[in-house]
Structures are given as C-alpha cells and as structure tokens.
Curated annotation (Swiss-Prot):
<dbReference type="Pfam" id="PF03143">
    <property type="entry name" value="GTP_EFTU_D3"/>
</dbReference>
<dbReference type="Pfam" id="PF03144">
    <property type="entry name" value="GTP_EFTU_D2"/>
</dbReference>
<feature type="domain" description="tr-type G">
    <location>
        <begin position="10"/>
        <end position="207"/>
    </location>
</feature>
<dbReference type="InterPro" id="IPR009000">
    <property type="entry name" value="Transl_B-barrel_sf"/>
</dbReference>
<comment type="subunit">
    <text>Monomer.</text>
</comment>
<feature type="region of interest" description="G2">
    <location>
        <begin position="60"/>
        <end position="64"/>
    </location>
</feature>
<keyword id="KW-0342">GTP-binding</keyword>
<keyword id="KW-0547">Nucleotide-binding</keyword>
<dbReference type="InterPro" id="IPR004161">
    <property type="entry name" value="EFTu-like_2"/>
</dbReference>
<keyword id="KW-0378">Hydrolase</keyword>
<dbReference type="GO" id="GO:0003746">
    <property type="term" value="F:translation elongation factor activity"/>
</dbReference>
<comment type="similarity">
    <text>Belongs to the TRAFAC class translation factor GTPase superfamily. Classic translation factor GTPase family. EF-Tu/EF-1A subfamily.</text>
</comment>
<feature type="binding site">
    <location>
        <begin position="81"/>
        <end position="85"/>
    </location>
    <ligand>
        <name>GTP</name>
    </ligand>
</feature>
<dbReference type="GO" id="GO:0097216">
    <property type="term" value="F:guanosine tetraphosphate binding"/>
</dbReference>
<dbReference type="GO" id="GO:0005525">
    <property type="term" value="F:GTP binding"/>
</dbReference>
<keyword id="KW-0479">Metal-binding</keyword>
<comment type="function">
    <text>GTP hydrolase that promotes the GTP-dependent binding of aminoacyl-tRNA to the A-site of ribosomes during protein biosynthesis.</text>
</comment>
Length: 397
C-alpha cells in the first residue's frame, strides 16, 4: 500500500500524555489511536510499539519519545508519549516536542502522585497552555465518592500551579477497556471518544508561526558595496516585506531600520516567510551596528532582558555533561538562538548544589541583554560543550 499523503486540510495540533509512572499514559495513547481509527479512520499503533520508544537527540540530549498521530472529525493530532520520567523532563525542557495541550493521565485508584505534581509544574514552567485530565482505571474503583475525591485532588493540584482547576475538563474512564474494545458503563471507547471531542473543543487551534509577529535570529552580517548591509538567518516566525520597519534587539541598545530587500538563493523577493533561510537588506544600518546573536523583529514585539527564572535540566555524565555538581554563583554560558552570553546562576533557597542529571529551577542574570520571551529555549555551555538545557519560565527584568 502506498504511503498516504499527509492531509494538510485538517488543522494540526500537538498534544502529549503526562502523569505518574504506571498510571496508564501509554495504554491511553494506544487506545486513542485505536478509537480514532474506528471512528475517524486514522492508523492504529500498538502498545508495544509506543512503549519501546526510539531514542532521539535534541540539543545533544538523548530522549526516548514515541510519536503517534490520529485524526478527529475536525483535526489532525500529533501525540507524544515518553516511557520514563526523565524523558518527560528532558522533552519538556528542551521543547523537543512542543505541546499545544497536554492530557494528564491520573489513576483513579491511586490519585495524584509525585510525578503527577511534577508534570503539572513542568507544564506551567515550560508554558504548556492547556491541560485536559483523563482519570484512568476507573473500572477498578467501585466507590463513586472515591472518584469524586480524586477528581477534587487533581483540580486542587492544577489550581496550585495556576491552571484553571475548577474549569478543567476531567474525563473518567478506562484506557485498557477502550484498548480491548470494551465499553461497560461507557468507560471504554465512549470515554476515549469523549476525550478526543474534549481536545477538539477545549484546546484552541494554535496560532501558526507565519501569523505571529516577525522574528529572525541573525546568524551572519555582510556588507554589499553599493547596496548596504545584509543580515542572514532562518525566519522563526511571521513575514518580512520590503519597506517594513524593523528593530534590531539584544546585546546592545535596540535600533530601528528598514527592510529594503529580501534575498533567497541569490534571487530577490518581495517577502520572506517563517521557516525560510534568507538575507534581509537593511537601509541605513552599518556593518558594525549589527552582530550575530541579535534578532531582527517587528518593532515593539520583543524586548531585551537580562534576568529571568528558568527550568533547567543538567546533563548527566553519560550524556556528555559535567562529572561534578555545581554550586550557587556558577557562571556558564547561556546559548540563545545563535550566540552565547555569560550568566550567573542563583539556586532556590535550601539548595546547595545541583548534580548532573537533575532538573532545577534557577534565577539567571546575564551580562548582556538578549531578546527574550517566556518559553524561549536555551542551552547551557562551558567552553562550547553543552552541559544543560533550559527554558525561560518567567522574565524578571
């Protein structure tokens, strides 16, 4: 059978399962593909295939992640599931699998556990915007009051981390029943169908990169005699058109300039779009006014900052990271988009040191400004060697 063509007509949404070990994330993932294949006609992926997730590298960090896809009536979903807790931590911090929404799987028989809490916190830190809850293994709970209690606990936990706990949709069911094609008390296939409908209605369609305000990290600067200065890079989002006013942000004071041409593969174009590698010709900007590591943006859309809180994963020795812990006052380089900037690390109160393989919240103060927004990913390096990965959780100044 020929490989089916990717259907671009349905809007594309990225989701993933999160939650404590053995609460049924992978079973639910398999059940979702099964139910959607019966109802909406996408492909089935078996449990074993998801569970033995392949290794992949993101920013030099090895992560095991399973990617499956399924369709609802109105959308195409790309879904990630990780076998181990460490894989979730790395995945969410590196942004290897960006989620537009997460499905929190919590066992109704056990209630919220340490990783339930940790994954909700991580979702908050890395900017997962929406969480839908699937209370799993409900077929093992006879007592309706117990179900209510677990539901209340989960809602409280979500509210603790600034998710709308009271309004979060919670679907009660059994992933295993759905996987086996059963549906007693509508806990099997019906519950999973309801989950998909909830994803459709509760998670808004994400804004496409091309519709966001223009941003291009500057990789290189050239001066072309008689034409002016050209900066090159890959457009991260938005569109740049000839005659657009632009700002150059980061590393020095912000300056304004105008785009007088867009060049791609030696051809002149009227515009450059998200995802394209191109050169942008700037009017009135000297070769020495711009450098790699700055960003070219739509005026007013991004501000330069130096101080922020971050969620960081420190590479283990096996991953090629440090062999020893680091302490407060640690000063590595932070690699944002295209450049390294030195920064100072403040650890949370009561934390003396950070071991390789840990994840930690820290406050970072950079020695130069960087154009940044909440959710921006970075690498931590020592002399060009990656020793950690992080994400901006909240900008301070």
């Amino acid at each position: 059978m020929a490989k089916e063509k990717f259907d671009r007509s349905l809007p594309h949404v990225n989701v993933g399962t999160i939650g404590h070990v053995d609460h049924g994330k992978t079973t639910l993932t398999a059940a979702l593909t099964r139910v959607c294949s019966e109802v909406f006609g996408s492909a089935v992926v078996e449990f074993d295939k998801i569970d033995s997730a392949p290794e992949e590298k993101a920013r030099g960090i090895t992560i095991n992640t399973a990617h499956v896809e399924y369709n609802s009536n109105i959308r195409h979903y790309a879904h990630v599931d990780c076998p181990g807790h460490a894989d979730y931590v790395k995945n969410m911090i590196t942004g290897a699998a960006q989620m537009d929404g997460a499905i929190l799987v919590c066992s109704a028989a056990d209630g919220p556990m340490p990783q339930t809490r940790e994954h909700i916190l991580l979702s908050r830190q890395v900017g997962v915007p929406y969480i839908v809850v699937f209370l799993n293994k409900a077929d093992l709970v006879d007592d309706a009051e117990l179900l209510e209690l677990v539901e209340m606990e989960v809602r409280d936990l979500l509210s603790t981390y600034d998710f709308p706990g009271d309004d979060t949709p919670i679907i009660i069911g059994s992933a295993r029943m759905a996987l086996e094609g059963k549906d007693d008390n509508e806990m099997g296939t019906t519950a999973v169908k309801k989950l998909v409908e909830t994803l459709d209605s509760y998670i808004p369609e994400p804004e496409r990169a091309i519709d966001k305000p223009f941003l291009m990290p500057i990789e290189d600067v050239f001066s072309i005699s008689g034409r002016g200065t050209v900066v090159t890079g890959r457009i991260e989002r938005g569109i740049v058109r000839v005659q657009d006013a632009l700002e150059i942000v980061g590393l020095r004071d912000t300056t304004t300039t105008t785009c007088t041409g867009v060049e791609m593969f030696r051809k002149l174009l009227d515009e450059g779009r998200a995802g394209e590698n191109c050169g942008v010709l700037l009017r009135g900007t000297k070769r020495d006014d711009v450098e790699r590591g700055q960003v070219l943006v739509k005026p007013g859309s991004v501000k330069p900052h130096t101080k922020f809180t971050a969620e960081v994963y420190v590479l283990s020795k096996e991953e090629g990271g440090r062999h020893t812990p680091f302490f407060k006052g640690y000063r590595p380089q932070f690699y944002f988009r295209t450049t390294d900037v030195t920064g100072n690390c403040e650890l949370p109160e009561g934390v003396e040191m950070v071991m390789p393989g840990d994840n930690i919240q820290m406050t970072v103060t950079l020695i130069k400004t960087i154009a940044m927004e909440d959710g921006l990913r970075f690498a931590i390096r020592e002399g060009g060697r990656t020793v950690g990965a992080g994400v901006v959780a909240k900008i301070i100044e």
